[in-house]
Amino acid sequence: MLSCSLLFSDPFFLLNTLHYSLIFRFVKQFFKKYYVFSLKIVKIYFLTQKTRIFIIEEKAQNQKASYNEDSFAMLDDVLDWCETYQVYAVVDFHAATAGQSGIPCDDGMDNGQHLYDDEESMERMFLLMEEFMRRYKDRWIIGAYDCINEPISMTPRREELTPKLVYFYEEMIRRCRKIDQKHLFLLNGTQFSSLTYFFDHEFDPEYHNWGISLHAYEMVVPEVASLASVLRTCREQKICLWMGETGGRNEHAWQTTMYEILAEYHAGYNLWCWKTVEGAGCASILNFNVPDEWHLITDYAINGAAKPSYEHAQAIWDSYLECLAVDKCKENTQYHPYLLREGNFEIPAIGYNALPMDSHRGLSDLPNAAGYRLYDRFELVYEKGYHPEPAGFAAPGPIKHPRDHVQLQLGAGEYASYTIREKETYTVSVTYCADKEVKVQVAIQGETLFEGVMPPAGEKVTSDVHPYFAYETAPNTLERFTLGTVTGEGILKIEVLDGCARFGQIVIRKSGK
C-alpha cells in the first residue's frame, strides 16, 4: 500500500495567522488531489523538539504539562480531512523532545541525542504521547503512531544508548496502553531506522499491536537479501513491517523493483515526500517553483552574499508560501507509473518478482558475476563494454548505478515474472539481444500472450550521458520486440524454450500512447 508524507512542523504551521490560513488551504487542496491519486495513507510528521507545537514549556498551575490547543485544533482539521477523503493517517513523532537521532532532521540542540540522558525530556515525551492517546483513542482514521524517527543514527554511543531506546519504547507503550488499547505502534530501529536486531521480544505484551518502521533509499540494494533480517524478525515476533520512509532521486528502476518486493512480502511503503521544488529530481507527488527572487535568500544563507532587508526577505518568503498552493503546483507524473506500475513505464529485466516457487526459475550452477540476487541462480551479466568500478557502491563520489548496466540472461527452461497493474489496454514489449534465434513463451495470468521465435538482435554500445545521472554513461541500446496487447492487470511470465537471450527492460505502453 503506497502512501506519502505531509510535514506538520514549526516553520510552516506556526508562523502567523496569515500563514496559518495559507498553509491549511494548501493542505486541504492537497487532500482533494490525494483522493484523485487513490493513495491510501498520509503520514503526518511532527517536530516535537519545537515543544511549543504541542506542549508548552511553562507548566500550568497544578498540571504536569500544558498543551497548545491551537496546534491540536490544526491536527483535528487534518484528521477530519483524512476522514472526508478516506485517507488513513499515520502520526509520526519525527522529533522527540531534546532530540533522539543525532542528525539535523529532529531539530535537536547541537544534534545530540539528549532524550536518552535527560529524564525530564523523556518524561515530557511520555506526557505528550499520553495526551495524544487521550484525545485520539477513538479516532479510527489514525492507522498507526510511528515512533520515533531514525533514533541513534550518527553517534559512537549507539551500543550504549540502544538499551535506553528499548526502555523508552517499552515504557511508552506501557503508559499509552492504559489509555488507548486500539492503535498500532510502529517502532523505528537505530542507524537511520535500519538496524532492528533488538526487536527480539514482545514490546506490547498485553495487546500485541505493534510493528517495525523501516527506512530505505537508493543506497539499499533492491533485493530480498537487504530485507531478510527485518523480515525474519517480523515473522518471529508475528508483527507487521512498514517502509515508513523511502523515495530517492530519479531512481525509477530502484523504486519499481524495491516496492514490488515490499508488496510481495505484504509491507506497505511511504513516499518522502508529498511536495518538492521543481528540478529536485525527487519522487514526490507534486512539484512547485520558487519565486524569482528566491536566490537572494539562498545566496545570503549559503554563500554569504548581500543580506536582503527584513521587509524584502519577508516578501520573498510570502511569495514562497504562495508558490506552495496546490493549484500552482505541477503533478510529478514521471514517478507515478513506476511507483504503482500503472500507465507507461519500464521494469528492469533484473527486477523480476522476488517470491520463490512460481515467480522465477534460474538454472545456473554458479553465482552471477554482477553480485546481485545471488540466490536466484540466474546469469546476470554486464552489458557489452561496461566495467564496474572495483569498489562498487563504496567508491568515493556520487553513487554509481551498475545495475542499470546489467542484463538478465535466460536460457532454455528459465523464466522470470513481472507484476503489471495497468487496468486498461496496453502493449507489452521487451528490449533484448541474442546471437541466434530464441524461442520464447510469454503469458499473463496464465493466458498465452506470445509463443514463437524472436530473431537475433544486436547491442549498440553507447557513450551517451545517462538520462538521469550526468556523471554516468547511458545503458546500451537493445533491440525492442513487441510481444502483444493486453487488457487488465496481471503477472507477466517470460520463459525461454530454446536458445538464449539477454533482456534489458520490460516496456509497458498504454494503447495510443
Regions found by a protein language model. Name each.
Residues 53-55, 149, 189, 273, ...:
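Residues that line or immediately flank small-molecule/substrate-binding pockets and catalytic motifs
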Residues 325-513:
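Extracytoplasmic
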Residues 1-2, 7-9, 15-18, 25, ...:
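Active-site mouth of glycoside hydrolases
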Residues 253-347, 361, 366, 375:
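Aromatic-rich peripheral "rim/lid" segments of glycoside hydrolase catalytic domains that contact
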Residues 52-54, 215, 352:
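Short loop/turn segments at strand-loop or loop-helix junctions that form parts
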Residues 126-130, 134-273, 284-292:
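Extracellular glycoside hydrolase catalytic/binding regions
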Residues 89-90, 242, 348:
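Conserved Rossmann-like nucleotide-binding pocket used by diverse enzymes
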Residues 55-59, 97-99, 151, 193, ...:
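Feature marks short, surface-exposed loop/turn motifs that line or immediately flank catalytic pockets
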